[in-house]
Amino acid sequence: MLEQMGKAAREAAWQLAQLSTKQKNQALIRIADLLEQESAIILEANQLDMIQAREQGMSEALLDRLLLTPERLTAIAHDVRQVCGLSDPVGEVIDGSLLDSGLRLERRRVPLGVVGVIYEARPNVTIDVASLCLKTGNAVILRGGKETHNTNQATVKVIQQALEQSGLPAAAVQAIDKPDRELVIQLLKLDRYVDMLIPRGGAGLHKLCREQSTIPVITGGIGVCHTFVDESADFDKALTVITNAKVQRPSACNALETLLVHQKIAADFLPALSKYMEEQGVTLHASKSAMVFLKDGAAKVVDVTEADYRDEWLSLDMNVEIVSDMEQAIDHIRTYGTSHSDAILTQSLHNADYFVRQVDSAAVYVNASTRFTDGGQFGLGAEVAVSTQKLHSRGPMGLDALTTYKWIGYGEDLVRK
């Protein structure tokens, strides 16, 4: 089964690589239109997944990721149209030179070929990945989690219908329709056809892919994100940023999970924080030192554990730790962070510069919410993933991350001497 999918994807990728930007954009517009026209079918399938997920006791955080609403589907279709407006990187000449030999050399962007994506309870990934791959002339093989089986199948069917109506091969976007884990292992070994693999899910999935895949793997998306409030921070502004980072969408991988507070301001800042968090329904997981200032506050507070610092909450929970100085804050991030998104709230330019230099994460912020780590917010369009590694892409992966390059040499009957 996967062998046939791989062959079909490879053939489709060759055809996609020949398309003009106009042809690709026309197909994207058709996909967006059909997603809206067939929204009832997709939403009905999503409700089946939601019912099954609730029966199986899925957490509220994961249920939120799984849920599609008419508004969310409309927003997703809008994102597909936004991809049309993005510059097509395929064919771009990255650099070029005329060599002493007389050879005129260019380095030109080309599609990767076939991309494999394995993801869990995130039905929006199906459309985001398909649109970005199509724009960059790549075919894609999708393997969604069993939680999103009905939604994914309905969505891919609509996408394939739109592709065929646009004169493109349906095999450009394929989905593995069985939740069998053995098929995941088979996909990881499909290096004959698949050029890059992207897992989007928990630590277990990432570990499996790193250990079992014979295909280059881009890992990331696990976001234990930190914000450090230094002694010079403006309290009101800091509390606004913290609230946004934690509350706007707690199930997102760029949501704030651990707050680090300088000891010089803890006695005044933490009671104010407690009031803000109580209003938002956030439970605080406090260290022993932080508990002194939070135990009588408005927000619910419990003792933090070592494991809490290492895991994503993906919910209205937040760790709170007091640090003695900037160095301790940075050391905490190095110890427990996942190199995703980390921030400092400060009025000191010196402290901001030092933090930015010392924290080795894909995205580092000064006086801004970690929620900005997103392809759309970065102006990249819908993202295929957020990479926390350094090769071959880092941070939100937009269109450029789905390309490679080839060298092209022009000569006039030129021979090497």
UniProtKB/Swiss-Prot annotation:
Cellular component aspect of the GO annotation: cytoplasm
NCBIfam families listed in its UniProt record: PRK00197.1, proA
SUPFAM superfamilies, per the entry: ALDH-like (SSF53720)
Highest taxon of source: Bacteria
Primary role: Catalyzes the NADPH-dependent reduction of L-glutamate 5-phosphate into L-glutamate 5-semialdehyde and phosphate. The product spontaneously undergoes cyclization to form 1-pyrroline-5-carboxylate.
Enzyme Commission (EC) number: 1.2.1.41
InterPro entries: Ald_DH/histidinol_DH (IPR016161), Ald_DH_C (IPR016163), Ald_DH_N (IPR016162), Aldehyde_DH_dom (IPR015590), G-glutamylP_reductase_CS (IPR020593), Glu-5-SA_DH (IPR012134), GPR_dom (IPR000965)
HAMAP family: ProA
Keyword Transmembrane tagged: no
Single GO MF annotation: NADP binding
Localisation: Cytoplasm
Main location, first listed in the record: cytoplasm
Listed pathway(s): Amino-acid biosynthesis; L-proline biosynthesis; L-glutamate 5-semialdehyde from L-glutamate: step 2/2
Species this chain originates from: Photorhabdus laumondii subsp. laumondii (strain DSM 15139 / CIP 105565 / TT01)
Family the entry assigns: Belongs to the gamma-glutamyl phosphate reductase family.
Record's keyword terms, sorted: Amino-acid biosynthesis, Cytoplasm, NADP, Oxidoreductase, Proline biosynthesis
Top-level class of the enzyme under EC nomenclature: oxidoreductase
Keyword Cytoplasm (UniProt): yes
Reaction catalysis annotation: L-glutamate 5-semialdehyde + phosphate + NADP(+) = L-glutamyl 5-phosphate + NADPH + H(+)
Protein name per UniProt: Gamma-glutamyl phosphate reductase
Biological process (GO), any one: L-proline biosynthetic process
